[in-house]
């Protein structure tokens, strides 16, 4: 019983120590990530995720034999939708 209590106290202490000694600028990194995401929501052209240069436009063949980029829309039934 004493060993179990000591183990619980040790785990709680190590968990608290991890949070106390965490990198001080980690909250700043999260804030910067939030600001970047907010900027991309306000200005969709700024987002890199909206560009898909390596995809096939609608109407191009995309059957199982073809090895190449996927359809831009994500839908393929022998031709890109």
UniProtKB/Swiss-Prot annotation:
GO CC terms: extracellular region; host cell presynaptic membrane
GO molecular function terms attached to this record: calcium channel regulator activity; ion channel inhibitor activity; toxin activity
InterPro entries reported for this sequence: Conotoxin, Conotoxin_omega-typ_CS
Disulfide bond sites: 55-72, 62-76, 71-80
Localization terms from the record: Secreted
Extent of the signal sequence: 1-22
Propeptide: 23-52
Expression across tissues: Expressed by the venom duct.
Alphabetical UniProt keywords: Calcium channel impairing toxin, Disulfide bond, Ion channel impairing toxin, Knottin, Neurotoxin, Presynaptic neurotoxin, Secreted, Signal, Toxin, Voltage-gated calcium channel impairing toxin
Taxonomy, superkingdom: Eukaryota
Domain comment quoted from the record: The presence of a 'disulfide through disulfide knot' structurally defines this protein as a knottin. The cysteine framework is VI/VII (C-C-CC-C-C).
Function: Omega-conotoxins act at presynaptic membranes, they bind and block voltage-gated calcium channels (Cav).
Annotated family: Belongs to the conotoxin O1 superfamily.
Protein name: Omega-conotoxin-like TxMKLT1-0223
